[in-house]
């Protein structure tokens, strides 16, 4: 059975809480169909976002799509994953609750110098913090 999630990309704004859902703040959105648990997807996001620099939020979202689409490397050749990862128009969100088990919010300022991640299981906030902390919290 698939463990699905949405990955939302949002601007950090003063006074906006990281431990609440903020679908009205979403700039970009990815639908991830499989392996969305924090110990899989969360660790992947934490490791990737900790070590890469981005120009702006569009660059950040594109980088995450690229990372999630590349599944296996053999002899230097990476094989892109077909399916499973989809870009979704965030303006089409009506009620996203009900079919995804996890929601990831990636928060950043316009210069992408500081990134924070929030992880939810339904309406329960499981994690709020920087990428490295997410990675170390859920690594086996």
Feature-to-residue mapping (PLM):
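Short beta-strand scaffold segments in enzyme catalytic cores
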Residues: 4-9
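Low-complexity intrinsically disordered segments
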Residues: 46-140
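Short, flexible N-terminal segments of the mature chain
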Residues: 15-63
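Short acidic-glycine loop/turn motifs at beta-strand connectors
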Residues: 10-15, 107-111
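Residues that flank catalytic or metal-binding motifs in active/ligand-binding sites
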Residues: 3, 27, 100
